[in-house]
């Protein structure tokens, strides 16, 4: 079996909902990191890229009709290069990386761009067609996140709890209290603020330029969602979003955001042919299913399954990038794995509570950030994992090449 190497990884800043990136279409936003890969890797013959695999969770608006293909063309890749868009909801871009790695390991590809994009600010309202002529069954659905066009049979089988409701379910099932969730959220904000102050994220971010009718373009080059001034007192005053005695708040949950990320993944043959310098090797990946009502717990079994599959241990992981959909689920996962709530190896530069969670782009962000952390600290292995709506979990392990 061949090796699959990460050659480069880049992302846009993550914008706040209705923030700086809101004027940018999803396909234009998705093109930004691909274009950056092209500019940063001049040795590559881009016509020889075997595929572009992009994740996107919505696909109901401007991200319709294969946003991966549209982003690739808008970025300037030759039209001969194929592209596809996959949808494993929040785990889409992590899955895209895993699919790219499998294709390369199987000898079916040598060069693949994998990543994802999400513009939650521009998610449209949609309306289905009537079941009958002049019917009145239609209703308008907001596609920003969560369920729409619910299947009554699925609802009867597993329920259709909202994402915050699933987090409450996890908090109750695994005894994660409000104080611990708020403390976890505070640490995420503090770590992100520290990383931003040190310029950690600058190495993984490509600026987005937004042309204006008059004057210079607006340049977005910094993540907009972090709140460096967050305090535990402020977090404790926020009202629960699900029920009066609940524990999940806007402060201990991830954001609704816009962003894109892309990685260049290559085989041994491509590395040699284009004189590329591998940064990391993709070791293994897996996905699992859990009961949809506790979807946030899914990274725990996914990580356990993956470590067994890769014949590695949790102690061998130098960095763990666990997507912080909610503090409740992140704590349930880390505690199940035997990790302390403030583990230094888990999200050392903060996570989605601070940085934000543009669904289809987040997995690629996790890998990009994990890779940079490995390189900065000299670590060997990084594990990236995410919970996914409708009861799924996904995980992937990379190994820094120079540590091998």
Name these PLM-found stretches.
Residues 24, 56-112, 141-147, 157-162, ...:
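Conserved catalytic cysteine-centered active-site region
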Residues 22-91, 95-112, 116-135, 205-221, ...:
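Conserved beta-ketoacyl condensing-enzyme motif
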Residues 111-169:
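Flexible glycine-/small-residue-enriched beta->alpha junction loops
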Residues 27-42, 67-71, 96-99, 163-170, ...:
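Short, well-ordered amphipathic alpha-helical segments that serve as non-catalytic structural scaffolds
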Residues 166-168, 201-206, 212, 283-354:
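Active-site pocket-lining segment
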Residues 11, 23, 27-32, 43, ...:
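N-terminal extracellular/periplasmic Venus flytrap/periplasmic-binding protein-like
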Residues 1-26, 145, 230-297, 301, ...:
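Condensing-enzyme catalytic core mediating Claisen C-C bond formation in acyl metabolism
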């Amino acid at each position: 079996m061949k090796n699959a190497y990460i050659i480069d990884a880049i992302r846009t800043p993550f914008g706040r909902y209705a923030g700086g990136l809101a004027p940018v279409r999803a396909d234009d936003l998705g093109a930004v990191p691909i274009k950056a890969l092209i500019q940063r890797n001049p040795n590559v013959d881009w016509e020889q890229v075997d595929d572009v695999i992009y994740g996107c969770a919505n696909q109901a608006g401007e991200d319709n009709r294969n946003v991966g293909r549209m982003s690739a063309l808008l970025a300037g890749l030759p039209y001969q290069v194929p592209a596809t868009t996959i949808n494993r909801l929040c785990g889409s871009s992590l899955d895209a990386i895993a699919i790219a790695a499998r294709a390369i390991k199987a000898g079916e590809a040598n060069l693949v761009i994998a990543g994802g994009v999400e513009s939650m600010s521009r998610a449209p309202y949609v309306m289905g067609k009537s079941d009958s002529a002049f019917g009145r069954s239609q209703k308008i659905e907001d596609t920003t996140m969560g369920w729409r066009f619910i299947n009554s049979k699925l609802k009867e089988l597993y329920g259709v709890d909202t994402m915050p409701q699933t987090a409450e379910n996890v908090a109750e099932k695994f005894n994660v209290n409000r104080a611990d969730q708020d403390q976890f959220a505070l640490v995420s904000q503090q770590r992100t603020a520290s990383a931003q102050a040190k310029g950690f994220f600058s190495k993984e971010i490509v600026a987005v330029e937004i042309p204006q009718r008059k004057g210079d373009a607006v340049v977005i080059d910094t993540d907009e969602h972090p709140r460096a001034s967050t305090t535990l007192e402020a977090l404790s005053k926020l009202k629960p979003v699900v029920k009066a005695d609940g524990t999940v708040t806007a402060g201990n949950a991830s954001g609704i955001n816009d962003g894109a990320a892309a990685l260049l993944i290559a085989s041994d043959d491509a590395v040699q042919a284009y004189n590329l310098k591998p940064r990391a090797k993709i070791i293994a990946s897996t996905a699992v299913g859990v009961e949809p009502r506790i979807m946030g717990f899914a990274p725990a079994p996914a990580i356990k399954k993956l470590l067994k599959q890769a014949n590695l241990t949790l102690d061998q992981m130098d960095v763990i990038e666990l997507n912080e959909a909610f503090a409740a689920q992140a704590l349930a996962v880390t505690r199940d794995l035997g990790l302390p709530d403030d583990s230094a190896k888990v999200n050392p530069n903060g996570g989605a509570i601070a940085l934000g969670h543009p669904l289809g782009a987040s997995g690629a962000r996790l890998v990009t950030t994990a890779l940079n952390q490995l390189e900065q600290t000299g670590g060997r292995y990084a594990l990236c994992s995410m919970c996914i709506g409708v009861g799924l979990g996904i995980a992937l392990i990379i190994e820094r090449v120079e540590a091998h």
